[in-house]
Amino acid sequence: SSGSAVNRFWQLPQSYEELVKRREAITAWAELTYGYLGRSPDHVGSCLAGMVMGIDVFENHSPQRARALLDYYEYVRDRDLFVTYVIANPRSDHSKAVGQQEEDQFLIAAISDEDSEGITIKGAKMLGTSAVIADEVLVATGQPLRAGEEMYAFCAAVPMNAKGLKILPRKSYEAAAVSQFDNPLSTNLDENDAVLFFDEVKV
């Protein structure tokens, strides 16, 4: 819509031919990394493009939120930003629901405050694949919630350098690799999954 050239994975295909070109571009990404990067930049980019393709679903729920989604898509598309996502919840007791974790109501990322300027997020989310090299993170909930758990029901886009956002990555495979000759994959293709902790992050 901007008239500028952008990465093919941001494309919203309108024909079979455009869909084929998009698929060929994503195939090229996978071939470049031998299929070892499960969360390369085209992954969440394609997710956002898919949401925009179905923007009418969002408009039926909230025209304002739909506009915000479209604006965000255009923002990251035009800057070709690497967006990761976190949708899984850390739980100390897997037999209990999200809102029944006894240790701390903010073990899982939740809205701790809300005002006219936005929301404040506190708590952790997983599993931020490539978070250490991403530009932005899409924070959402990927599991059903119960009545009374509304504080956990949100979706937000956050810059990875946001004040209060802490990245807790696993150890890098590359750091332990002996050499590129001995470890050709781990020296080049490490996504570094991470737990993200939101310490009163304002959105």
Tell where the protein language model's regions lie, with residue ranges:
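Internal helix-loop-helix
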Residues: 2-83, 130-131
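FAD-binding core of flavoproteins
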Residues: 85, 90-203
